[in-house]
A protein has these predicted regions:
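Conserved GNAT acetyl-CoA-binding A-motif
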Residues: 127-140
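A short, internal acetyl-CoA/4′-phosphopantetheine-binding micro-motif in the GNAT/acyltransferase core
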Residues: 104-112
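A conserved beta-strand-loop-helix scaffold within acyl/acetyltransferase catalytic domains
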Residues: 65-74, 80-81, 86-98, 102-105
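Conserved catalytic-core motifs of GNAT/GCN5-like acyltransferases
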Residues: 17, 151-166
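Extreme N-terminal basic, low-complexity initiation segments
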Residues: 1-9
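Conserved active-site alpha-helix within GNAT-family acetyltransferase domains
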Residues: 2, 139-158
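Conserved acetyl-CoA-binding loop-helix of GNAT-fold acetyltransferases
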Residues: 2, 112-125
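Short amphipathic alpha-helix that is part of the acyltransferase structural core
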Residues: 26-70, 75-80, 156
Length: 167
């Protein structure tokens, strides 16, 4: 059933749909499980609880990143097999088919195992599914973003990745 809703998810990854409720609003969330270079399974999913966003903020602060979350931000987080937060990214929707990716961070202990690569790939799949065609980032970590297909486009004031939208 999850594959019918999200046909662009890699068949090598295990996916599940988890229902969460916030007040009166019920939501289906896609959870992807992926194996990294350390041979361990990691989960990639949106936050289910406000405290997960608070923990993500702590990871950003530990990485010397000064950030302010707003109600327009959306999050995609990574967790280890003991459900400990290992990193994530956050973005905001701009107009129709554009999002601005604010920051990507992985805790030091979990770097160099391709977790950020899996997270970015998952993020691109989700954005593609949502009909997003353009992802912009600032001029930071240019090597990292270039590896993920971002190119400098002055008219967007930063680096840009153009997705092949399904719609």
């Amino acid at each position: 059933f999850a594959r019918m809703l999200f046909p662009n998810v890699d068949s090598a990854d295990y996916i599940e749909l988890v229902a969460t409720t916030h007040g009166h609003e019920a939501r289906l969330n896609l959870v992807t499980q992926t194996e990294c270079k350390d041979g361990k399974i990691y989960r990639i999913r949106p936050p289910f609880l406000p405290k997960e966003i608070a923990r993500f903020h702590s990871i950003l602060t530990e990485s010397s990143l000064s950030v302010t979350f707003t109600s327009s931000h959306e999050f995609l987080l990574t967790f280890n097999n003991r459900n400990r937060l290992t990193g994530g990214l956050y973005w905001k929707k701009l107009e129709n088919n554009r999002v601005h990716l604010e920051w990507v961070v992985i805790r030091k202990k979990y770097q160099k195992i391709e977790l950020s690569k899996r997270l970015m790939s998952d993020f691109f799949d989700r954005m593609n599914h949502d009909g997003i065609g353009i992802i912009t980032v600032g001029f930071y970590a240019q090597k990292f973003f270039a590896k993920h297909g971002f190119k400098i486009e002055k008219q967007h004031g930063g680096m840009v990745k153009r997705l092949q939208t399904m719609g």
